[in-house]
Amino acid sequence: MAAKDVKFSRDARERILKGVDILADAVKVTLGPKGRNVVIDKSFGAPRITKDGVSVAKEIELKDKFENMGAQMLREVASKANDKAGDGTTTATVLAQAIVREGMKSVAAGMNPMDLKRGIDLAVTKVVEDLKARSTPVSGSSEIAQVGIISANGDVEVGEKIAEAMEKVGKEGVITVEEAKGLEFELDVVEGMQFDRGYLSPYFITNPEKMIVELTDPYILIFEKKLSNLQSMLPILEAVVQSGRPLLIIAEDIEGEALATLVVNRLRGGLKVAAVKAPGFGDRRKAMLQDIAILTKGEMISEDLGIKLENVTLNMLGQAKRVTIDKDNTTIVDGAGDAEAIKGRVEQIRAQIETTTSDYDREKLQERLAKLAGGVAVIKVGGATEVEVKERKDRVDDALHATRAAVEEGIVPGGGTALLYATKALEGLKGANDDQTRGIDIIRKAIETPLRQIAANAGHDGAVVAGNLLRVGDVEQGFNAATDVYENLKAAGVIDPTKVVRTALQDAASVAGLLITTEAAVSELPEDKPAMPMGSGGMGGMGGMDF
């Protein structure tokens, strides 16, 4: 076991604080509309230029083990804020640095770290209550666009594209971001349900120009097992042929003889058919097949439910207006499903999202929900160079998360003013003792720092700007750093999602509280590796050979 280096109390806290400061100072220059860029060197390819706080935080690794502990804990703040709200990472980092600095000063002055933490937690709860009370719901796509514009550092096109996408697929819909080939921003909207399985054989193609299968008014057979021969399916296939309508088969897999028979029938023109594999794996596959069944008013043919293939009738098959299949995706448009049944299924998935503890499961459930409730929109981000495209894609991702957060919990005035005015909610709040009251004061001071930093990045004195606003006392008034004007920020469109501000503060206080109450730090000592012995010249063992 390797030897350990242990640091205690003041020595440990000072080294950790140094690491916190290094990371926070690199991240906070990106805050606000006039925040600066950070250039990140890459081991391969061109350097990356970004204004995204979490991207900067993730790249920082320090040589000193103890300083690195502080930096990594602060990186955790940025990552947590990013995971929960998708934005507010720089705000969270600035808040955490302010809380850690003041907290460590107080601990050095002899205050009880645990009481300081209790005071901090008390103040954070009060500020969160105040933010929720002042939050207003998002109304209309213009406010959604505005949230996107602010989060994308003033890029109007980004905000408008996100608002347009949300309008088309609904607030529950899936919106994905991809890199485009050209210079322009593009928005593609897929109606209906899409899943990532393509046709099993190119012989099913009906439109050779576009290399896709198009089925109009098809029946849809949803089968949860593999199909290796079609003997048991003959009755239903004959019924479909007589109806004159096409058939889509969705099954776990369609192998050998079964696939060959379908292809031959398709080529002879007797049966208009296409086959795809079922989406997902395991239990998730069953759930997704059930979703498709509800969407198309069909039944999932499952032997577990006592339904055999030979007993299937036409009214057990799903129906849709149109199905399009390319080599990678299948899209079912306008399924014949009952609106009430679909609504019930949506509620059921929502309940599962609430109770699940796994981020992966939650993401997959949200995808299923979106496919049932709305549709899928793809925003394609263009640019002149690869570096520009990547930087813009980062901003679009941030803006997308921010707009979702705004729809979820509403909005507050932006530019750091919501937290600045929350200091009023802390007036008169006292802890059980002086140390707890000091913890409350730490938060009162810390929640001014985002506004001060935004003003400083715009070339103003942060303390003067904060003082001016607190003197005016109108909670709608703020400092618009983009135009250097004091004005009503909501009216000017400078707004932040309440969820982003709330999670930034809660995550910052959580990690800062842990750092303040740290009394020892343990790290591995580097091993002294012995120097490699000097090799003798030539090839060993070849001496004495006379050529």
UniProtKB/Swiss-Prot annotation:
Keywords: ATP-binding, Chaperone, Cytoplasm, Isomerase, Nucleotide-binding. GO terms for biological process: protein refolding. Its main location: cytoplasm. One of its GO terms (cellular component) is cytoplasm. InterPro entries: Chaperonin_Cpn60_CS, Cpn60/GroEL, Cpn60/GroEL/TCP-1, GroEL-like_apical_dom_sf, GROEL-like_equatorial_sf, TCP-1-like_intermed_sf. It is found in: Cytoplasm. Residues 535-547 have a biased composition (Gly residues). Its EC number is 5.6.1.7. GO terms for molecular function: ATP binding; ATP-dependent protein folding chaperone; isomerase activity; unfolded protein binding. Residues 527-547 are annotated as: Disordered. It is an enzyme of class 5 (isomerase). ATP binds at residues 30-33, 51, 87-91, 415, 480-482, 496. It catalyses: ATP + H2O + a folded polypeptide = ADP + phosphate + an unfolded polypeptide. PROSITE patterns: CHAPERONINS_CPN60. Together with its co-chaperonin GroES, plays an essential role in assisting protein folding. The GroEL-GroES system forms a nano-cage that allows encapsulation of the non-native substrate proteins and provides a physical environment optimized to promote and accelerate protein folding. Forms a cylinder of 14 subunits composed of two heptameric rings stacked back-to-back. Interacts with the co-chaperonin GroES. Belongs to the chaperonin (HSP60) family. This is Chaperonin GroEL 1. It comes from Sphingopyxis alaskensis (strain DSM 13593 / LMG 18877 / RB2256) (Sphingomonas alaskensis). The gene is groEL1.
